A protein has these predicted regions:
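N-terminal glycine-rich anion-binding loops that anchor highly charged ligand groups
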Residues: 21-35
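Short, well-ordered coil/turn segments that N-cap beta-strands
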Residues: 122, 145-146
Length: 353
């Protein structure tokens, strides 16, 4: 078994916590000695023990770690946060070598973990290949803004709604389950006031007791004109209203209103960055999506295409502002979801090696 195989095991461990770690990265670990896997572990939840400590806790006898090799998908931390530093625990356990999937881009770590381990007699090796585990986390600490994904479903003739201002349900069950997974991977979800009025969406992830559900954001000119009987306001979890006017009514402790003279996509991104929100899913509508594309702030586009023809004056998927220049994206994958097809593209410079 090669280093890459053990690292792949660590990746599978990390993925068990998808949607549970909030602004923390997904991290998995595998402890190996004499070609035998002694223990595996991962970071289960935001605020809980880190992957390295979780792995060590699974040993029948702590002495087993002496002389072992630890495979971990992300550089171990060397600072005191919600948890004590992992590097200290790793060194104290007598681990001989740590094989690392990627250096942590967060400036509080960024090479300091490797330095600590080396200074305490632990061999280290960075082999790469785990960057795709934490695309948004890496992007946020490298680019200092959230990773933006634009998502929409459309008919085969490129329309998102039938003519007339009523909701058109386009995709089947498999695509809707896939959307749930996509929401789980994002820390915030944004829609415009029109989408709230026409679709009356929940924008929730159907997982009970999710510790940090995505923040749901509604972009509106006047928050007071929103329909507060909409089902989004009957659910738990944070809701942000981005309005040009102050909210004059009390609509619940989980609703927060931010005001600006005009909420441009750049201002939205700036607000999220200030709150250390690393990922945003823009779910509509047509106008809001056009604004984000026109300002060149979309890093990934997820399109669900269904074999329906809406025709006529039905609303196109992206409608509004013209582009100053053509945006180039690269195909990530195409997936069949029963009768629907999902196409994912990502901006070239955002592709993880």
């Amino acid at each position: 078994v090669q280093d890459r195989d053990y690292m792949q095991m660590a990746v599978q461990e990390a993925l068990k916590a998808q949607g549970m770690t909030w602004t923390n990265p997904l991290v998995g670990a595998v402890l190996v000695k004499d070609g035998q896997v002694l223990a595996t572990g991962y970071h289960h939840q935001f605020g809980k023990e880190h992957a390295e400590v979780n792995t060590l806790s699974h040993l029948a006898d702590p002495k087993q770690a002496r002389g072992a090799t630890l495979y971990v998908t992300l550089e171990p931390c060397s600072h005191y946060g919600k948890q004590p530093p992992c590097c200290k625990k790793v060194a104290e356990a007598g681990i001989k070598k740590v094989v690392i999937g990627q250096v942590d881009p967060h400036q509080i770590v960024a090479g300091k973990g490797i330095k600590y381990l080396k200074s305490h007699g632990v061999q280290t090796e960075v082999i790469g290949g785990t960057e795709s585990l934490n695309v948004a986390y890496n992007f946020f600490y490298q680019q200092e803004r959230p990773f933006v994904t634009l998502k929409y479903a459309m008919s085969i003739d490129g329309k998102i709604n039938a003519a007339g201002k009523r909701r058109t349900l386009l995709t089947g069950d498999a695509a809707q389950v896939d959307v749930q997974k996509l929401r789980l991977q994002n820390q915030a979800i944004l829609i415009g006031a029109n989408t709230l009025r026409i679709d009356n969406p929940l924008l929730t992830v159907r997982i009970k007791n999710l510790p940090h559900p995505p923040i749901r954001i509604v972009l509106t000119k006047d928050a007071n004109r929103l329909d507060f009987t909409s089902q989004i306001f009957k659910t738990r979890g944070q809701i942000w209203l981005l309005s040009e006017t102050n909210l004059t009514q009390n609509v619940g402790e989980n609703v927060c209103c931010y005001t600006a003279s005009k909420w441009t996509p750049q201002k939205v991104i700036q607000l999220l960055a200030e709150h250390e929100i690393q990922s945003l899913l823009v779910e509509g509508g047509s106008n809001v999506q056009a604004q984000f594309i026109a300002t060149d702030l979309v890093d990934e586009i997820v399109t669900y295409i269904t074999p329906l023809v809406l025709g006529g004056t039905a609303l196109p998927a992206v409608y509004g502002q013209a582009l100053a220049e053509i945006s180039h994206y690269q195909l990530l994958d195409v997936k069949s979801l029963n009768q629907d097809v999902r196409i994912r593209v990502r901006r070239k410079e955002c592709l993880q090696e």
